[in-house]
Amino acid sequence: MPTPKKGPRLASSPAHERLMLANMATSLFEHGRITTTLPKAKRLRPLAERLITFAKRGDLHSRRRVMRVIRNKSVVHKLFTQIAEQMEQREGGYTRIVKIAPRKGDSAPAAIIELVTEPVSPKKAVVKEAEAATKVAAKEEQTEAAAE
């Protein structure tokens, strides 16, 4: 069977990459942050955010989809109970990648990927409401001008 040519690979085969990302996601949800290389962190971020989105839904099908990737039941339980509740107000951007000094042995670019646990600032919510109100007011003015 030929190996897929689409996109860069972190490991020797696509199956190995899937397993490696699943293990890294398990460690991320278990510990809250992990130190790894920058390319691995960049490949892990979309997977972790997708799994958190499934956990926020909270239904049985979402739990089963997460269990396909994360095989540890205690980590899945933590994801659905604790992490999903922390991320309830957040609409995305559940993880943060911070670059750190290169790894000592081989000078590989290292990074820390962590879950963002800070609450969403209320200022952003107020700004979004104000922008929405401005758009509604502009549309109303256009309809009134067209009616006259």
UniProtKB/Swiss-Prot annotation:
Keyword Ribosomal protein applies: yes
Matches recorded under InterPro entries: Ribosomal_bL17 (IPR000456), Ribosomal_bL17_CS (IPR047859), Ribosomal_bL17_sf (IPR036373)
GO annotation, biological process: translation
SUPFAM superfamilies with a match to the protein in the record: Prokaryotic ribosomal protein L17
Pfam families from the UniProt entry: Ribosomal_L17
Residue ranges crossing the lipid bilayer per the database entry: none
GO cellular component, one term: cytosolic large ribosomal subunit
Domain of life: Bacteria
Entry annotated with the keyword Zinc-finger: no
Stated family: Belongs to the bacterial ribosomal protein bL17 family.
Assembly: Part of the 50S ribosomal subunit. Contacts protein L32.
PANTHER family: LARGE RIBOSOMAL SUBUNIT PROTEIN BL17M, RIBOSOMAL PROTEIN L17
Protein name as annotated: Large ribosomal subunit protein bL17
Organism of this sequence: Bifidobacterium animalis subsp. lactis (strain AD011)
Name of the coding gene: rplQ
